[in-house]
Each structure stands twice: as C-alpha cells, then as structure tokens.
C-alpha cells in the first residue's frame, strides 16, 4: 500500500504517483491487466490534464517498466516528467526511455537530482 498526491498551488500542478503505478510483475497476465486498469482509472480522476510536473515510477525490476509512464502520458499528460523508483539503477532506467511508448517524452524527462525548470513553468488550465 502507498499514497499518491496531486497538488495544485500557485498556478502549477504536480502529481506524485508514489506507489500508484501499473505494476507489471512476473505473475499471471490477468493480475497485470487488473493493475493497469486500476492505474488508468485512478489517473482518469486527474482533471483537467495535463499536469505540469509528474513523478512516476520507472522500476527496472518490472516486466514492463514503461507501462506506468506510458499510461500517465496517455490518460493525463505532463509538461515535465520525473522518473522515480529506479533506486541505484539510473543507467538501466535511462535505457528504458528507449521504449517506443516513452521515446516521444525524452525532451521533458528529468533524471538529475536537481532540476531548474524554465521560469515560470507553463501553468495548467
């Protein structure tokens, strides 16, 4: 169990996915499908999209590590993307961005520990 947060403040929206994700583990396909459906249903509650900042798991241990970010961008969208939950596997996480579903978002994806975004971040509607 875990938490996820959507924060809107000062004209900027930030979504922290926390442990809410499309968890695609090595298990029966119907369990992974249920995880994907649940994640997309929860994401659909974020209206209006896109969010300005999104912090979403990109966990190399998963069978389909890109599923969560792909779902977020499909359902909600984000102006800046911050992968997380890759622990010490930064190189592996960066390599996962070559997934065809994620490649379009390379320009908005940030792996650095400190990131200065353009001022101001274009606020969401």
Language-model features: where?
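Core dinuclear metal-dependent hydrolase active-site scaffold
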Residues: 1-50, 114-125
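Active-site metal-binding loops of divalent metal-dependent hydrolases
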Residues: 18-22, 58-60, 85-87
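Divalent metal-coordination and catalytic microenvironments
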Residues: 19, 54, 81
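Short linear motifs at secondary-structure transitions and domain/linker junctions
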Residues: 28-33, 56-58, 84
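A short, acidic, amphipathic alpha-helical segment used as a generic capping/interface helix at domain edges
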Residues: 38-44, 61-71
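Residue-level detector of structured alpha->beta connecting loops
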Residues: 50-52, 77
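Conserved Switch II/interswitch segment of TRAFAC-class P-loop GTPases
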Residues: 53-63
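Binuclear metal-ion centers of metallo-dependent hydrolases, dominated by the metallo-beta-lactamase
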Residues: 65-125
């Amino acid at each position: 169990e875990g938490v996820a947060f959507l924060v809107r403040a000062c004209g900027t929206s930030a979504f922290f996915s926390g442990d809410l994700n499309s968890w695609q583990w090595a298990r029966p396909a119907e369990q992974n499908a249920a995880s994907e459906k649940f994640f997309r249903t929860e994401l659909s509650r974020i209206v209006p999209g896109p969010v300005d900042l999104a912090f979403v798991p990109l966990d190399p241990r998963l069978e389909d590590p890109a599923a969560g970010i792909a779902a977020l961008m499909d359902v909600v969208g984000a102006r800046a993307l911050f992968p997380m939950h890759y622990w010490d596997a930064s190189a592996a996480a960066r390599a996962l961005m070559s997934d065809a579903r994620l490649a379009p978002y390379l320009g908005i994806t940030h792996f650095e520990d400190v990131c200065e975004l353009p001022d101001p971040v274009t606020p969401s509607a």
